[in-house]
Structures are given as structure tokens and as C-alpha cells.
Amino acid sequence: MNRPVHFEIHATDPATLSKFYADVFGWQITHMPQFDYYLINTGDNDGPGINGGFVKRMGTGAAAGAPVNAFVCSLGVASVDDAVAKATAAGAQIALPKMAIPGIGWQAYIRDPDENIVGLHQQDPNAK
């Protein structure tokens, strides 16, 4: 109980941003026109993870250089280096470069094309 069960990514243009996440992370997106909502299926239900949705951003995002004022999620990836390369090739920017979390793994943060911060996590007990 009290564990995350759904997430939402706010987007200026949900249709465009959903394509970025589908292309970079392989997510399946289903548009629900009656709600102007985009359901996100992040993968099969056999492993850890949750699904979510894209919602139209109401108003402007945070000012450039402002601290994050959000609930930031990290995505489990096979390779932080590969995920960062694929994301930046698709229009993301590096928010914080790859860093070791000793004995746990590697972490990096990107800023998607609509300025949302997303963590990328690669498990690696040998990370130093």
C-alpha cells in the first residue's frame, strides 16, 4: 500500500511528446480522445514498473535554472550511456551527467523536449 501506481507527464503537446517516449523508450501510447489523454504502457506486467499518462500542461513550466518542483521518476535502463545517447539524439538534453552510486549502479538525468526531468538508472553493483 502507498506505492506509486500511476504517473503523469505534463506536456505542452502530448501527441508530440508521446512520440519521443515511444521512440526512445519503446513505450506503447494509446490516445483517449474523449478525455484528450494519452495512456502510457511502459512494458509487460511481469516485472517491476508502473504505467501512466500524458496530460496537457496547464500554464508555463518552471523558469530556466529553477530547481525541480516535481516528483521525478527514474527509468530502469540496460545502459545509461545508450539511453542518454538515444534520448539526446531525439531532442533531449542532459540535465545531470552519468554518475556512480557506489555499489548500486549508474544514474543520469535528462530533460525531455518539453523540459520535464527524467532519471535514467542502470543497476550495477560494481559501480564506483
Question: Where on the chain are the PLM-derived regions?
Answer:
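Core segments of cupin and vicinal oxygen chelate
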Residues: 1, 8-49
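N-terminal beta-strand motif that seeds the catalytic metal site of vicinal oxygen chelate
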Residues: 1-18, 70-75, 122-128
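Vicinal oxygen chelate
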Residues: 9, 30, 84-128
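Short hydrophobic/aromatic beta-strand element in the GNAT-like acyltransferase core
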Residues: 37, 74, 107-109
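Short, charged/polar surface micro-motifs in flexible loops or helix N-caps
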Residues: 44-48, 60-61, 79-81
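A short, structured beta-strand/loop element
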Residues: 49-56
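Mid-chain, well-packed structural core segment of small domains
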Residues: 64-93
